[in-house]
Amino acid sequence: MKPILIWAIFILFCSVLLVQQTLLQDKSPIETNILALLPENQQDPLAQQAFNQIANNINNRVVFLLQGKNRDTLVQAADHFSENLIKLPLFNEVEAQISEADQQAWASLYFPYRAQLLSEKTKSQLQKSAASRVLHVVRQVYSPFAGVSGGELKSDPFLLFRDYLSSRNSSNSHFSLYQNYLLSSVGDDFYIVIQASLAGDAYDTQLQQQLPQLLALEASVEQVFHVKLLHTGTLFYATYGTESAKGEIGTIGIGSLIGVLLLLLLVYRSSLPLLLALLSIGCGLLVAFVVTVLVFGKVHLFSLVFGASLIGVSIDYAFHYLTERLMHQGEWDAKRALKKIFNAITLGLVTSLIGYLGLLIAPFPGLQQLSLFSIVGLSSAYLTVVLCYPMLAKSPSKTSPPNLMMLHRWLQLWQNKTLRFILPSGLMVVALLGLTQIQFDDDIRQLQAMPEALKAQEQKIKEVTGVGQQQTLLLVKAPSDELLLQRLEQLSRQFEQWEVSGEIKSFQAISQFIPSIKSQQQSYALIKSLYEHQGETLSKKLNFSEQIVFNHSFSPLLIEHYLSSAVAKPLGFLWLGSIGQQSASVVIINDIKNTALIENYLQQQKAVSVLDKGAEISSIFAHYRLFISEMLAAAYFAIALLLIWRYGFKLAFKILTPPFIAGVVALAITVVFAIPITIFNLLALLLVLGIGIDYTLFFAEQKQKSESANTLLAITLSAITTVLSFGLLALSETQAIHGFGVTVFTGIVVAWLLAPLAMQREHQIK
C-alpha cells in the first residue's frame, strides 16, 4: 500500500475520532480551567484536598444581590426571580427564602445537647460569678422585649441555650429575616441575597452556553420591577475567559488563514497551492487535537491558542515546496523537488522537535500537553507535505514567477562583509543593554483577564454581605478529630481578640458551630454546678412552683451530627476529615489589617499552614520558568551539535546565530515595552528558535547561489504569515498572552532579517 494512501486513511480515521470527541460526547473536550494546566501539590495531599474542596464549593455557587428602594417591591422581584431561576437548566438548587425547616434546624441540632453548650462569653461569666446569671435571667423575664415564654423557662430556666444560639448566629448580623428572605439595608437601599448551585462544572463550556438565558432573566427582572440585580461567581469569570480565548483563537487562526490565502493568491495566483497549504495546516491541527484528547482526555484552551500559532511553522514546509514549483515551471519534477528540500525541512522539523521534547518530560500537565500538541501538529504537517505534495502537485505551475528584484537587492547587501558583521553585532549589543532592565513576574493573575464590570459587582456583594474583600485560608491539622477541634478553639480565641481589636475583620471556623468534647465537658460541669448552687435561688426569685433540678446526662455532640444537619450547609465544606493519620479543617480569615502580626503568630503554630494557591502557583511558574530556561539552553546545545556534525563549526555558527540573536532581541523588546518576563515569553523563544532555524537551514542547504532569492521568497511568505498571527496575538487582553505575542512577533522579524547570514559563499555541503 502506498504511503499516501496509508496517510489518507489515518487522516480519515482522525476525522472520525474528532467527530466522536466533539459532537458525540456529553461534555466538551475543551478544558477552560487554568488550574488544570498545573501539577497538583505532591508535597502535602491535605493541602491539595483542602484546595479542591474549597474550590469546588466556590466554583459551583452563584450569588445574586437584588437592590431596591422599596422593601415590598424588592420581595416581589425576589419571588419572580427565584421562581424562574430554578427553571433554568443552569441550576439544580436555588436558596432564596429560608424555610421553616431551615429555621428550626439550629434548635433541632443543638437543643438535645443544651446542657453542655455555652458560648465563650457565658462560660467566662459563670467561671467568675455564677450568681450573676440569676440576675441576668430575672432581667430578661421582666423585660417586655426579651420574649421569654413559660415553656422556654421550663426547658432552660437559666436561658443559656438562647445565649448560645444567639452567639452562633452573630455572623449573620448584616441581615434580618423579612418574609423569609435575608434582607439587609444600607442607607436608603434594601438588599436581598439569593444563592444558587450550578447543575455542573463552572468550567464546562456547554454549561456556559446557557448563561445568556440567565442574563435575559436578570434584565427582565430589572426592567419589570425597577430594581438592580448584581451577580458574582466563578461561572461568570470562567465564561468571560472562555469567550475571550475563543475570540483570540478565532482572531489568530482566522487572521493567519486570511494571511495565508492572500499571500498564496498574490504570489502563486492559483487554487492548487492554496488547497495544498490548507491541507498541511488542517492535517497538522486535526491530528494534534485528536491525539492530545486521546492522551489527556481534554485539550486546554491555552494549547489551542498556542497550537493556532503553529500555522506559522507548518506553513513554512509548504511554502518552500510551492516556491520550487513556481520557479521551475519548464523543468518541474514533483519528486525531485521534494528531494531537493527534503534535508532542509527534515532538519527544520528535528530542530523544532528538540525544543519541545524537553518540555514533554516536565511533570507539568500544561507543558506536557502543549509539547505533545506541538510535536504531533508539526510532524503531521511535515508528513502531509512529504507524502501528499508530490502526488497532488505533479503538474507544473502555469503562473509566471513574481519579480524578485527587491529580494535580489536585499541578498546582494548581505555579500558586504561589513553588514554581515555590523548588523548582527549591533542588534546583539543593543539587546543586551535592554536586558539590563529585565524583570520576571510569575503571578498567576497574568493568565486571567479580569473584566472591571464583574470585579465591581463582586466587590459590592462582598461589601453588602459583610464578607471580606480579601480572604486568607488556613489549613489546620491534628492527629484526631477531637484534637483538631481543640486546636481550632485555641485559634478561635486568638482570632476573636483580633476581631475586637480590628486586626482582622472576621473569621469562620468549624469550632464556632461544633465545640470539642473537652469543651462540652467543661460546659456540662459549669451548667451542672449552676443548677446545683443557683437553682433554688432562681426558683425563689421567679416564684416557681417546682424546684429547678438538673437531670441531664452527658452525651457528646459530634462532628458527624453537625455535618449531617442543614446547619452545616454554609460552612460544612471547611471540614476535610481524616486523610491517612491526620484530621484537617480550613479556617477563613477575612481582611487582615495587621499582616505582620498575623504572619508572626502563624509561623509559631506548627500545625497551621497558609493555603495560598496563588503563591503556590506563582512558585510553580517560577520553578518551571527556570526549567524552560534550562531546556532552551539544552535545545540550543543539542541543535548546535547536530549542525556541527552536518555542516562543520563555521557554517553551524552562522545557522544558529540568527535565531539566537532574534531570541535575545525579542526578550529585550518585550522588556522595553515594560512587559515582565514570564514562563510564556520563554515558550515564545522556543517558537522563535524553531522558526528561525528553519529560515537559516534553507539558506545553508542551497546548492546554487541562484536559489537564494527563491529561498528568501519562501521564508518571507512564512514570516509574513507568522508575524500576522502574532501581531494579532499581541492584542490579547490577557497580559501573559499579550507578552507572548510581542516576543514571538519581534523574534520572527529579527530571525527573517538575519537569515541570509547563513548563505554559503562556497556552495558545498559537508
Predicted segment positions?
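Solvent-exposed, non-transmembrane loop/terminal regulatory segments of multi-pass membrane proteins
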Residues: 22-69, 172-178, 437-479, 696
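Juxtamembrane segments of multi-pass membrane proteins
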Residues: 424-541
